[in-house]
Amino acid sequence: MSLFKGSGVALITPFKDEESVDFETLGRLVDFHLEHKTDAIIVCGTTGEPSTMPDDEHLEVIRFVIDRVAGRKPVIAGVGSNHTKHAVYLSKKAQELGADGLLHVTPYYNKTTQKGLIEHFKEINDAVSIPIIVYNVPSRTGLNVLPETMKELAKLPNVKAIKEASGNITQVAEIAMLCPEIDIYSGNDDQIVPILSVGGIGVISVLANILPDETHDIVEYFLNGEIEKARELQLKLLPIIKALFIEVNPIPVKEAMNMMGFNVGKPRLPLTTMTEKNREILKKALVDYGISVKE
């Protein structure tokens, strides 16, 4: 059984001016997604900035979101690390907190080989009993999960899915061919329809932070056979998607949410606020779509 079909929001983490987590705003964001069409909540994925959180804060954010959701939608915890024992520790803690699944980015910086990648996930698999989503994002990690490697990972009983953000549709198709038992989620908002077309069942989305219903609708249209509607909506959203990645994620999406009145604060250093030029491009994309923004 799939963790979810449709749109899983890669939830941002709001911060106060002194950079502590703004749990009051975080609660409102969770409620926003519970009230809209978001199908799953991914907490402390890349967009949630876990790389600048100590473990106690990281786990407290996960706990807070799980408790706030209270079983109404699946909560998937981002607990990846380039240190296998650390990844195991975070995975066990997230499972204890009640996470429905785990999102694991591949090891980064030290990178490893494909063999090391398999051994890394074996250790994690053996430590937990909830579904694991492998997160392949070579642009950030310097490591690509090859289709043949994913075939080996699919033999692990808790590895159930892959978030594919390689940008390589041929590779995604090969994974779908070699691993029919594995659920595939697009990791790129501009490739939702292409990945659905080769067997994907959803997206783990930055866009869903600001347009949860539309992001869900792309997937629902496609899976219901309304391919043209899905295609049209994917293309209609493309200017906003491009603007959301005009600088490193999550800088633009946080700026967009602030423009929309969510008051989520700034990202933590080393991420900075947007340049004024790019901010105006983002603002125009939002306004052109019909989103009300603060001046």
From Swiss-Prot:
Recorded catalytic reaction(s): these are: L-aspartate 4-semialdehyde + pyruvate = (2S,4S)-4-hydroxy-2,3,4,5-tetrahydrodipicolinate + H2O + H(+)
Q: Which EC class is the enzyme in?
A: lyase
List ligand-binding residues for pyruvate.
47, 204
Identify the metabolic or biological route this protein is part of: Amino-acid biosynthesis; L-lysine biosynthesis via DAP pathway; (S)-tetrahydrodipicolinate from L-aspartate: step 3/4
What Pfam families does its record include? DHDPS
Q: Enumerate the UniProt keywords alphabetically.
A: Amino-acid biosynthesis, Cytoplasm, Diaminopimelate biosynthesis, Lyase, Lysine biosynthesis, Schiff base
Residue numbers marked as site, Part of a proton relay during catalysis: 46, 109
Main site of residence?
cytoplasm
This entry's Gene Ontology molecular function terms read: 4-hydroxy-tetrahydrodipicolinate synthase activity
Q: Where in the cell is it found?
A: Cytoplasm
What InterPro entries does this protein's entry cite?
A: Aldolase_TIM, DapA, DapA-like, Schiff_base-form_aldolases_AS
What EC number(s) would the UniProt record show?
4.3.3.7
Gene Ontology annotations of biological process type: diaminopimelate biosynthetic process; lysine biosynthetic process via diaminopimelate
Identify one Gene Ontology CC term for this UniProt entry. cytosol
The active-site annotation reads 135, 163
Family, according to the entry, reads as follows:
Belongs to the DapA family.
Q: How does it assemble?
A: Homotetramer; dimer of dimers.
Q: What does this protein do?
A: Catalyzes the condensation of (S)-aspartate-beta-semialdehyde [(S)-ASA] and pyruvate to 4-hydroxy-tetrahydrodipicolinate (HTPA).
Protein name, UniProt field: 4-hydroxy-tetrahydrodipicolinate synthase
Source organism per entry reads Caldicellulosiruptor bescii (strain ATCC BAA-1888 / DSM 6725 / KCTC 15123 / Z-1320) (Anaerocellum thermophilum)
